[in-house]
Structure formats: structure tokens, C-alpha cells
Amino acid sequence: ITKDQLQEWVDYANKVGAVIIYDAAYEAYISEDNVPHTIYECDGAKTCAIELRSFSKNAGFTGTRLGFTVIPKELESNGTKLNALWARRHGTKFNGAPYIIQRAGEAVYSEEGKKQTKAQVAYYMNNAKVIMDGLKNAGFSVSGGVNAPYVWLETPKDMTSWEFFDYLLNN
């Protein structure tokens, strides 16, 4: 989604009093200039948006479950500050990620961590490119592989997904 398109959603949410839950887990994969890295690049987002961040996609933390939620202090719903409400709920229900996982998350933001994360993202994006190119060369209509390492295509009508998977493996 482009920044202009996202701005339309932010404007709409502010107009009708809605709250946007924005998943920014793939932020590290964004390569296009007109795609925002955070919803807070949009004017007015702090009064209508909650952003979810994860270390799973950019730093390979899939099994360790570390992420964070951004809830601006400006965000209210029905006169209630959502940041304070979330802090109370979170403090009551969750004791935090294990210390070793917190330290690993901290390392992601070090110079070496940033370098390794960038290399990992580039590796995954190259894999997506190889898959896209191979499928296109095989005559399939393919999309994706930009701003996220995923590739989509429609399987031929006469094949189940498993039959198509076998076809790809064997051809």
C-alpha cells in the first residue's frame, strides 16, 4: 500500500472514530520509495492507529516470539486513552519476554545486528526473485516478491495444489 493510499485510510479512521491495527512485521522488506515503513509517516495516524512490530520476519525470531506494539498516547476510544489501558492490561497479564530473548532483540538494533538483518532480508528477497523468475520462465503468471518475500500464482484449473506442487518438484 502506498503512503497516499494509507493516508486515505488514516483520514477515514479519524473521520469515523475507528482504530487501525497496522501490521508492520515486514517493514524491513520494503524497497519501494512510496511505501511507508510505519503508519506514523501518515498525518494524523497517532490519533487512530496501533502498530504491531515483530522480530520474526526481519531477524529470524520466528520460534522465540519477540515483538512490540506501538500505541500512541494520543490515541483514544470513547474518551479512554488506549495506551494507559493497554499498559494496565499488559502489566497484569504478561511478565515479559525471557531475558535472553530481550537481549537478542537488543542485539538486532546494534550495528552488527542491523548488518546481519539486512543480509538476511536480502537473502530472502533474492530467493523470491529466483522463484518468480523460474515460474515466469515456465509460463506462469506470478505476482509478489516486492516489499515481502512471498510469491503468488494461480494453479492450473485442472490440478489440485498438491498435484501442482508435485509438478513443480518434478519439472
Regions found by a protein language model. Give the residues of each.
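PLP-dependent class I/II
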Residues: 1-171
